[in-house]
């Protein structure tokens, strides 16, 4: 993961995720956890979610959705993604425990990826359906907005420059997985 970061591959993946969220802002409650989940699966660490937090907040605000809703699901999704990542220590350890019982590594991955992703989507549905998503009806936000403590959402960073080997580093990393 360090080599991927140094080559700019992680920045490239985050940029792709940002584009997905910004192109589909109305579905932020489902896409934010999906993006952080798959970033975690690819990277093997939940730290990739940190780079998505500002984007999730901005996109949610632009759609009048409380940022706490997609953020809470996204953070949980990134941590659950660790238990489904083929490069995480958690999955490697679990495969060591289950191998004597006849559960192969690919079988374990199939079970973990499908069940954890379904759980994330069910949680996103529950949060989207049963929580108050309307940012304009939040009195605390309205107070902070009136006091000038809340910054307006910023647009996509157009100054982003991709490092020369970023795309290749992602390809090499994916082949290595």
Predicted feature locations:
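Hydrophobic alpha-helical transmembrane segments of polytopic
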Residues: 28-32, 71, 172, 176
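Primarily residues marking transmembrane-helix entry/exit sites
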Residues: 26, 68, 166-170
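Juxtamembrane helix-boundary/capping and inter-helix hinge elements in multi-pass membrane proteins
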Residues: 6-9, 22-23, 59-69, 95-106, ...
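Small-residue-rich segments of transmembrane alpha-helices in multi-pass membrane proteins
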Residues: 26-30, 84, 145-149
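Long, contiguous bundles of hydrophobic transmembrane helices that form the permeation core
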Residues: 110-177
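Membrane-embedded alpha-helical segments and adjacent helix-loop junctions characteristic
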Residues: 1-62
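Alpha-helical transmembrane segments and, especially, the helix-loop junctions at the ends
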Residues: 36-53, 66-111, 116-128
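Membrane-helix interfacial "entry" motifs
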Residues: 21, 25, 100-104, 108, ...
